[in-house]
């Protein structure tokens, strides 16, 4: 409560807020006693760690944009949408500055050693990641649907469409229709690195919302293509979602799988382009994964990293990630 964060985890705490807001949206009577306090406390206190929720890591900032948009959706309190829009401006001002277009991971001078470990981040501007560019597209698309004429007509939708055109031409989506981790800055080509589950999920709700804005099904069609390809390429024989690091993820990568699960639930509940067979595939995916978590990855309500088991040590990242899948399954039941 002192920091408004969970275990001092900065961007994972944004995902906890998003998960709880999602739970609140579908089960308000069950959630309200918890979420009323969480939303107000985190909103008031967490930015004491980084004023304005800005730390120069564009992906971190954009996770908070998505969190406060989700909270706005369930509270209708404009202060949350105001905050999301304010945070977004930092990334908007930086978009397009890389040699390949798009957005960097991080401002060169940004680093708070007490909160973040920089070993994996691009302090020297040597890589352009998928994550921050997916988050940018999704954040812009969501802001466009909630503030289509503020601060001016087209302000956000133009950013979302620009980000979409950049992303599909970037090469980040590979021949298997899944998304690699980034671009090689020397060649502006797909770096062929890890295919993480969260990179398959972040884009999905933004693409679905672009179809809402434009009436063009191609955006939602791409979301379905990526989602189905991820289920094919990132699940085990039992259909349980995996990540390349599942036997040794760090505290950040522990968060990843839940992002994909939450995105699949969004498509089931809110996508306007979804045939019955694809919907059934998504619903089954969520239920199978939630059941596996509870049967094989849960001890005394503590949820571990590997959704197929064996049971492991829980952290706020593994807990909230697994809860994304469980909440998702409940929301589509």
Each predicted region: which residue ranges?
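Extended ligand-binding groove/face enriched in aromatic
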Residues: 37-146
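CBM-like carbohydrate-recognition segments
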Residues: 1-59, 63, 71-74, 80, ...
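Active-site cradle of extracellular carbohydrate-active enzymes
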Residues: 133-136, 140, 144, 153-210
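Oxyanion-binding "anion nests"
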Residues: 202-214, 218-235
